[in-house]
Amino acid sequence: MRLAALATLGCAALATMTAPAMAAWRGYISHPLGFAFAAPGELKVEKGTYRGDVAGQHDTLVYRFVDDNIEYKAVVIDMRDKANDAATLLGEAEYMFGNGKKVLMDTFGRVDRQYGRKLTVDLPNNGGRSSAAFYFVDGRIVSLQATVLPANGDYDTPEMGRFVDSITFFTIRAPDDAIELPAPPK
C-alpha cells in the first residue's frame, strides 16, 4: 500500500516538473466598452488603425497578451459614425481576417444576445493558426483573436478556443477579481 502511494506521489511530482511554465489566466473587464474576457500573460495596450474599403479608416484599441508562443488580442474598432452599416462592416472585418488564408472554420455565433462570427484560419507560409470571434456592439467591432505561432506548433491547442470563447457582454459575468482594462495611450 505504501509503495503504491509513493509511486503515485512520485509520478505526480514528475508530471508537475515536466509541464511547461504557463502564465495564470486572469479576468479582464472594460466597463466603458461593455465586455469582459480572460487571458494569460502580461497585458500590453496599443493604439492602431483599421482600414477597410467600406469602413474607411478608424482608430483601434488593442489589448495584447503573449504566452507560450500564442498571441492573444482583444481588438476594439470604433465605428460609431457608421453604426447603421453594422452588418456590412462586420462582414468586411471577417473577410479581411480570412482573406488570403486557408479558412478552416467559419460559423455564426451568439454571446449574451450579441450575434457574431467565429473563424479559424491557417496563416500563409506556415505562419501558424489563428482563431477569432467578431461582434458589433454599441457602434464598435469587438474581436478576440488568438494566434498559435510556429514556435509553439500545437495548432490544435484548446487555449485558442478558451480565449475566444471567454468573452461576455454582460459584465456582471466577469470574475469578481477581474482587472479593469486601462484606457488607451494618448
Name the predicted role of every residue range.
Residues 7-16:
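Bacterial N-terminal signal peptides
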Residues 35, 43, 88-101, 140-186:
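Surface-exposed amphipathic alpha-helical segments
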Residues 38-62, 91-137:
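Signature of long, low-cysteine stretches enriched in small and polar/charged residues
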Residues 60-87, 142-146:
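A short acidic-to-branched-hydrophobic micro-motif
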Residues 33, 68, 77-79, 124-126, ...:
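Solvent-exposed coil/turn segments that connect beta secondary-structure elements
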Residues 1-4:
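Positively charged n-region of N-terminal signal peptides that target proteins for export
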Residues 23-42, 183:
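Short N-terminal segments immediately surrounding and downstream of signal-peptide cleavage
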Residues 17-23:
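Sec/Tat signal peptide C-region and signal peptidase I cleavage site
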